[in-house]
Amino acid sequence: MAKGQSLQDPFLNTLRRERIPVSIYLVNGIKLQGYIESFDQFVILLKNSISQMIYKHAISTVVPNHTNNQEHNQSQYNNNNACISKP
């Protein structure tokens, strides 16, 4: 397994397994949105109203889209871990 794959696989697998919506930006600037249905060494299958096979060499960035529940959980995490300063 290539060293780069060790970062990609867990990241993409979490997005796929938890069905987190993603925005995929291509190197030509096009933005695609959907859910990662599957992936391998060379391609990602993106599912929205249709399935699209996207070659990884054409991808610039993969961005998870946060849902309200995820934002709420992050807000709770930040509030619970905030530093309390004493006068």
Swiss-Prot record:
Assembly: Homohexamer.
The major lineage groups are:
Bacteria, Pseudomonadati, Pseudomonadota, Gammaproteobacteria, Enterobacterales
The protein's matches in InterPro entries, at most eight in alphabetical order, are given as: Hfq, LSM_dom_sf, Sm
Name the source's superkingdom.
Bacteria
Disulfide bonding pattern of the chain: none
Protein known as: RNA-binding protein Hfq
Stored PROSITE patterns: SM
| HAMAP family recorded | Hfq
One of the entry's Gene Ontology molecular-function terms is: RNA binding
Pfam families given for it? Hfq
Please give an example of a GO cellular component term from this record. cytosol
